[in-house]
Regions:
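Residues on the lipid-exposed face of transmembrane beta-strands in outer-membrane beta-barrel proteins
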Residues: 48-52, 105-109, 123, 187-193, ...
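Residue-level recognition of beta-strand termini and adjacent short loop/turns
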Residues: 55, 112-114, 194
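Repeated loop/turn-to-beta-strand initiation elements of outer-membrane beta-barrel proteins
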Residues: 57-60, 117, 196-199
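Exposed, low-structure sequence patches enriched in small/polar residues
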Residues: 182, 188-192, 202
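Amphipathic alpha-helical segments in well-structured domains
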Residues: 217-224
Length: 232
């Protein structure tokens, strides 16, 4: 459990391991206390639906749902964690945000005739929008802050184990943003005979933003099926 020892030449505690020059292995207690990732996640969901009966067997339903997720991931690697690459400590901070909005409008019709024939039809449309963004910030502490003969700052961190962006000259930032929209119309119908024979027909057409500015901006896919209940 004695995972760190004091280094008088650097005036900090460093990794206590049999071979500090290797990168593959570390003292497990050091990893637990000085290389431990921390993450936080929040998720929110809101939704609702409204249904209206127009007449017997015919109804209209509208639904709306919104979801949002926020996640933060931090990893602070103390000085001497990785041989040759962590002289003063490295800071990694990642933040991810995502949200989704979905809504649809459905018309449903159900009818039975003399317990012999049945018909069930659903038709409608839907809208879906997804959006995600991420920001990753890495402060490399692989070298001491220095200035070359020309007076130009080269790289490095100012002080060891100070995990703040202001402590690092060498910062790496990566930002991503993605957004997608999907609009759809669809219909499905089921014909039944004496509750033993069923024929299903469905069709759907989607318009996706991922296909924008292409020849095939939408795609259509129908289906037909049948089923028989032998005991009927």
């Amino acid at each position: 459990s004695n995972y760190e020892v004091y280094d008088g030449t650097r005036n900090i505690n460093v990794h206590n391991w049999t071979n500090t020059a290797q990168e593959q292995f570390s003292n497990p207690y050091w990893m637990l206390n000085r290389q431990k990732p921390v993450s936080y996640r929040n998720r929110y969901e809101f939704g609702g639906s409204v249904k209206y009966d127009i007449m017997e067997g015919l109804s209209v339903t509208g639904r709306l749902r919104y979801e949002r997720g926020d996640e933060t991931w931090n990893l602070n690697e103390y000085a001497s964690s990785t041989a040759g690459r962590n002289l003063l400590g490295t800071m990694k901070d990642t933040r991810v945000n995502s949200e989704q909005t979905y809504g649809d409008l459905l018309a449903q019709y159900n009818k039975t005739w003399e317990d012999t024939y049945s018909l069930s039809v659903t038709a409608g449309g839907s809208y879906q929008k997804t959006k995600s963004s991420s920001l990753e910030l890495i402060g490399w502490g692989d070298s001491q802050f220095s200035v070359n003969d020309a007076g130009v700052i080269t790289s490095g961190a100012y002080y060891p184990n100070i995990f703040s962006p202001a402590n690092y000259y060498k910062l790496q930032t990566t930002k991503t943003l993605a957004e997608k929209r999907l609009n759809s119309v669809f219909a499905t119908a089921q014909f039944g005979y004496k509750e033993g024979l069923f024929i299903d027909v469905s069709a759907r057409n989607d318009w996706s933003s991922t296909l924008a500015f292409t020849d095939g901006v939408s795609f259509f896919y129908p289906s037909v099926g049948a089923s028989v209940l032998l005991d009927r």
